[in-house]
Structures are given as C-alpha cells and as structure tokens.
Amino acid sequence: MDNKIIDLFSGAGGLTTGFHLAGFESLCAIDQNKKALQTYHHNYPNAKVICDDIRNIKPSDLRSLLNLKIGELAVIIGGTPCQGFSRNVPAEYRYLEDPRNQLYQNFLEFIEEFRPRYVVIENVPEILRAYQGKVKYEIFGKLEKLGYRVNAKSLNASHYGVPQIRSRAFFIASLEHLLQFPEPTHSKDYQHKNDQQLELFSGYLSPITTVREAIGDLPPLEAGQSYELGDYPEPYQNHYQKILRHKNKKITNHIARQLSSIQLARVRLLKEGQDARNLPADLAPKKYYSGAYGRLFWEQPAKTITRWVFHPGSGRFFHPSQDRVISIREAARLHSYPDTFHFLGTYTEMASQIGESVPPLLARVIAEAILRAF
C-alpha cells in the first residue's frame, strides 16, 4: 500500500488534502469532532471515518479493522491537539500533565502497532521547546527506539505558497533514511525579475502569495450575505486561483457573517490595513488584541487564520475593501483549500474547521518530500 495513509486527529482534513494533492489516498480518519468528520467524509467518501477519542481506540483493533499487516501502511499523519502547548494559552495554564499534552503519546502507540514506512506529526512551534525540550526529545526517543530516523522543524506556510503567515512544527520520520525538509519556494525578499532574467536564473524564489491573489476573483458580498452555487464572475487571474479552482464549476461556502451595528460602524471607518488603533475614541474597544478589527492588506499575505476568523475583535479578519469579515470561502482560500473542498456545519463550526487545520499546500510539500524518498 505505497500510497495509503491514516490521519489521526484529522479534523476536517487539511493534512489529508495536502497528501491527496500529492497523490496519496486516505484509508481512515479519526477525530472526536463530529461535524469536522462529516466534512472530512463528504470530501473523502472512500475513507473510513471514526468519531471517537483516540484514547478509546486500541491500535491493534484499528489495524485489524483495516485488514493491514504490520509494516504495510505507507504513512501515518496527524496534527495532535495543540492548545496545551500554544502560546495563546496563558503560561500559568500550560503544564505537562495537561491531558491535551499527552495525546502525542497515544499517537506514538499507533506508530508502534502499524509500523508505517513514514510518520508525520504536526503541532505548534512551541512543542519543539516546550518544557526545556522534553516533549521533542521524548518523541525523538520513542520513534528512534522503533527504528525510525527523525527530523523536526518549524515551517512558515507563506514560504511555500500559502497566502498566510502561519508557522507550524513538523516531525517527519522514516524507517529507511533521514528525510530532509523541503526548501522554501516563496520569499518576501524576492526581487521581481523580467522573463528573460528568469529563464537564465534557476533556483529563484517566487514572491509570497498575497491576499489579492488568493481572493480577488471572488464575488463581492455584504455582511450577512452569501453566494452559494453561483458561477465565477470572471476567469482566474493568477496561478494560485487557477490551482485552487482546478475543475470546480460552482462557488460554495462564500458566506459572510452578519455584523452588529457597532461592528459595522467600526469597519466603515477603516481603510485597508487599518485596525482598532485607527478608530475614534467613541468607537474604539477598551481592550483589544494586536490587529483586532483590522482590515487585511491586499498586497500582503494574511496573518494567521484562527478558529475565531469570524470575529473581527479576534484579529485582522476584515475584508480589505468590503465592509465585512472575510467569508468562509475566502478563509479557505487564504488557508489554501481547493474550491472543490466543501465545508459542512454552522458558520462558526466551518470557521473552526479551517482555523484548526493544516494549510493543504503546506502539507503537500511534506507529502512530496516523502514521495521523493519512495
């Protein structure tokens, strides 16, 4: 089964989608979020989905259910829950005994049972230095004891074509040889060159993908409006839009959240790139996060898309020029989900599915690094 994967802690399927784009096929996904798994199953109907806490599943029972021999599976992937490591959690609430911080150990039990050729574990960058590196070295030690050669690194999604500044840590392990992480393909320091120069220069880095390149072709909306199953209003404008549209015919999930009267008053006063700091005193919130009530910049990548992307007070989530927060489809575009990927659930559930997942194009470069080692 050279191209088969199992996705643990799958969520809606960001990691799986990246591996799917690289040519892998999902056998099974496990997550305890029912709505996220419904989204996963809708997009990957041939994969078996199991809605349960991974701690309730015996690895040997799962291997028997999937009729797999030890060593037969190509890759086990998974983004273990990260809230217990995240810097967004106050330091006094981060501790090693937090149950969320122990789930990587359950992940490793599945590795021991299945012995896949390759392993990919994703988490927040803080996991690499959490508790004086104890977690990192425990993961290395366990995998090395099982015969794997392990590498770990934090990658910025914007350096691999994703129009979003988002850093994630990856552990990649192989039973055969030490895998190297892919080199960046995009850089904010890129200097534009004319076509003749490009033909002469190999190994150049492309410019970082911007918000305009990601969402500029989608039809305008007002707060509270949606554009479902409609046609694209114009042809794709760039390579990013081309690859995300792929063979998709109708736009889905282009839904803008309704705003309160004070939120509307705030956004109508803000220009592109401005935020709460630019609001008059009578409209400025008393307390706010950095970038809160901020409009995105057209010619820059987005800041990190979180599960709170629907709430303008939680970050820079206002559209660059329209008086609303970005739609679900726009958030998905900024996260590099193809337009063929359809999200299910309420507005907030869909926002969470995007914000808590791995950007597919970032996952794809990891998958392609594994393919090159096959």
Where are these regions (language model features)?
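Short connector loops/turns at beta-strand edges and beta->alpha or beta->beta junctions
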Residues: 81-85, 176, 310-311, 339-340
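Short alpha-helical segments and helix-capping/turn motifs at coil-helix boundaries
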Residues: 60-62, 154-158, 288-291
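Class I S-adenosyl-L-methionine
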Residues: 65-70, 83-283
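Proline-centered helix-kink/hinge sites
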Residues: 45, 80-81, 116, 163, ...
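Core alpha/beta nucleotide-donor-binding catalytic domains of modification enzymes
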Residues: 2-115, 125-129, 134-137
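C-terminal target-recognition/interaction regions appended to catalytic cores
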Residues: 230-374
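A structural signal for well-ordered alpha-helical segments within the folded catalytic domains
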Residues: 13, 105, 133-137, 209, ...
